[in-house]
Regions:
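Juxtamembrane "helix exit" motif at the C-terminal ends of alpha-helical transmembrane segments
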Residues: 42-58
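Hydrophobic alpha-helical transmembrane segments
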Residues: 58-72
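Alpha-helical transmembrane segments of integral membrane proteins
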Residues: 39, 43-46, 70-73
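Conserved non-transmembrane functional hotspots
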Residues: 1-41, 52, 62, 76-161
Length: 161
């Protein structure tokens, strides 16, 4: 493999990783909302239902609704706390920024000067450092980003991220 081919592979890899981390951040932000919004709505409904049940203590469906809302709210809150979707989203955003900086540095060098061995080593070390701190992608996400890079007109598949 020639140095030019290696740098070309690095450009593709950095581009894929950069985009995949942003896509992962969006994915985890959506999950955070999917769990968070229903929890807030259920909390409001539960609060309203408590006041209603005080007035209609003998109505069975009100008591059943309170139990269902309480259990659902506890389950969603627990899942949201356990999976830490907002934290995961933030970690992917940070990784995307770090990898983007490495990518932009490489692209700038390719435009304005030759890439020598010392520069290539420095880029590889920066990329390795960013990868060590980066979280893993959701299953199949990187492959979808790679497919989109090869076929830009293809729509992304709906599953996962």
């Amino acid at each position: 493999m020639t140095p030019e081919e290696l740098i070309g592979q690095w450009q593709q890899g950095l581009g894929n990783s950069h985009r995949a981390h942003y896509e992962a951040a969006k994915y985890y932000e959506r999950l955070h909302l999917w769990f968070g919004v229903p929890t807030v709505v259920m909390s409001a409904l539960l609060g309203t239902t408590v006041f209603t049940s005080l007035q209609h203590a003998d109505v069975a469906w009100v008591k059943t609704l309170m139990v269902v809302l309480s259990v659902s709210m506890i389950a969603l809150t627990s899942l949201q706390t356990f999976f830490k979707y907002s934290e995961r989203a933030e970690r992917h955003k940070t990784a995307a920024v770090q990898i983007g900086e490495v990518r932009h540095e490489l692209e700038q060098k390719l435009q304005f000067g030759p890439v020598d061995e010392a520069f290539a080593k420095a880029i590889r070390e920066k990329w390795d450092a960013a990868d060590r701190q980066a979280p893993t992608f959701p299953p199949g996400l990187y492959e979808r980003v790679e497919t989109l890079r090869r076929n830009p007109l293809q729509k992304p598949s709906g599953g996962g991220a």
